[in-house]
């Protein structure tokens, strides 16, 4: 029997081959059509998807302007720091927040709870930006960047630093974490100090590195700010105020020093103060600039204005003698601390005679005294431009009783700030010329408005020299071999119910040198409790 071998031979079928070629060519054609459609006819959607993955718009930071004193010494500067942020969408696409050593290291460095961070990212899976930490020092930020955590990036920013620490802190104020001023000069001049950030459109690779700058709008630079403050005088003023408040066991204090010929503020101190570089232990009360916000009745510091008004109205002459016996008005006894049957105008200031100025006030229409107070600066803001400044309070009455008119002459019935009182004494030092105040440096000459004849102010300013001499109430303000013209004052405080309480405000105001005044100074002690509460 013969065995047949079955041999499978390859067979060629033209029809099958043709169909295969048609299929291959058809697929290639479809691919080419699709590529042509995407690349030529309708590329926008593909480009949009690519841009969504790689294009990022970033702010171009502008450094906050520097604040300096009148000599150019820096008082507030910006230092470079970094912000750490996360792109939750990118992080989730790459596995989310992990619990490995790199994530643990970042969490420990930034004092973050890793579980809370993971929950935060998972609750915003499509977000593209969340802050993890702000104002981190660059060295720490660079170390975190080297961990190469998915979706975690750095952003350059700046933080405010105050080289002089607590010096002028209540005046300068401070900024928030976004570098926006929220207190003091930082807030009042925020627009000038911030400038305008720029924007740039960049393309990034999958690691977050910039590979192309598309467009950029440059930032508008911020302006620097030169204050009228002299850092050295500010330091001396603050040290003296701190010592005075502590020695007098006062609740708080304020002091203002003005350059008379320009109206520039050379020093403005408040106690208590704080360190703006570390505000953790400070209270809201520590932030107050008491020189512009606290109000009180000025007491005897207004007596020079009463005498000027009486001289201007011709009620008395510079050499007049006034009856200063105690007397009764509306059932209230008007008397002095000491007994003086009669005093000259100089004596009224030296002994701070309430009876003397009461007689002068009662001898003229009260409106004349109101006009003088207003002309010298009481009852309205100084125009310094600082946020939080009080306008004080000037009474508006239809009827003035004799007692009201008398007490108005020794500083009761109106409210003023330390800054307003300093402005008044700067006007006295300017021999009747009221100049606008300035917290920024300006150059003389500064024009002012005459509010009282020079001869009258000069005469009263000379009388004020007696207050610091033996027998006067301001001997503590005396400076050896140096002429000063001062006036002290004391007033009872008003309680929350609007009634006087057994607490006092004491103050000393004056100008120096008396022969040709260059500086006006006011010091206020709020509720001194170390024995005497009188100013001086």
Model features per residue range: what roles?
Residues 1-279, 367-379, 496-499, 526-536:
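Periplasmic/cell-envelope proteins involved in peptidoglycan metabolism and beta-lactam response
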Residues 76, 204-216, 255-300, 305-529:
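Beta-lactam-recognizing serine transpeptidase/beta-lactamase-like catalytic domain environment
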